[in-house]
């Protein structure tokens, strides 16, 4: 029997409806001669659409993970619905397998179609795990940090197993310093600092200028309400902006391990000690679930939802 022509739009629609993989959806449509409802039943019988009803649920728990390979590093976030699943060995192994592929894939779209050891794509493997684990799982984001020479520092906070935890940080230091061990130790300390102090940018120039102007406006209005003269207001606003920079700009923050010094001063001291320029080229800080709406449930609702499963 010759294969019937199945449109890409039909495959896409079935995939969105069921959450099954693209190839599985295409096969289901071929097997059912393009009948959409029968294709859904076909996938359900195969266990490939068992995750359908879970797709709409909020996944704000899970794990962040890092992987470093020489001068290249990657961080990912994979979400689950509960912390209980995040401590499940099956879920942890899934995250490990994904982060190992992420460093090769270079971007999230390429990662989703990357093949795992099972032969399935990352996207298909996640869907299969939704069916077996029983919660909505999502590969939310990834980012790459690369340097040409120097050291990459990393830190994982609330680590559940090596390199997997609630907060993951990568810091890239570009430098020709010969003492790589000391450079790596500095990069590690800065990574821990970033985890604890959550800077918004490396320096003032790279800080979101819209954010700066918003803060400036708030400070101005607040000072104006205090009835200060204009020339005093201007000085007060500039003083408050400087304080704001010291709170959100990495180089201007007081260093976690030497609070009397700023990060910029610590780097300058390290440059003198190592005899080479050191530059923070990039940092990445992934905090689990940041920016995701968290579903609030009372105890009665939670028990009711469990009994319905």
Swiss-Prot record:
Q: SUPFAM superfamilies from the entry?
A: Elongation factor Ts (EF-Ts), dimerisation domain, UBA-like
Keywords from the UniProt entry: Cytoplasm, Elongation factor, Protein biosynthesis
Q: Which GO molecular function annotations are given, in alphabetical order?
A: translation elongation factor activity
Q: Which PROSITE patterns match?
A: EF_TS_1, EF_TS_2
Tell me which Pfam families the record gives.
Answer: EF_TS
Q: Look up keyword Cell inner membrane and say if it applies.
A: no
| A GO CC annotation given for this chain | cytoplasm
* Subcellular location(s) per record: Cytoplasm
Q: Which residues form a coiled coil?
A: none
Q: Is Cytoplasm one of the keywords UniProt gives this record?
A: yes
Lineage top rank: taxon: Bacteria
Q: Where is this region: Involved in Mg(2+) ion dislocation from EF-Tu?
A: 82-85
Q: Which protein family is it in?
A: Belongs to the EF-Ts family.
Functional description taken from the UniProt entry: Associates with the EF-Tu.GDP complex and induces the exchange of GDP to GTP. It remains bound to the aminoacyl-tRNA.EF-Tu.GTP complex up to the GTP hydrolysis stage on the ribosome.
Q: What is this protein called?
A: Elongation factor Ts
Name its species: Rickettsia typhi (strain ATCC VR-144 / Wilmington)
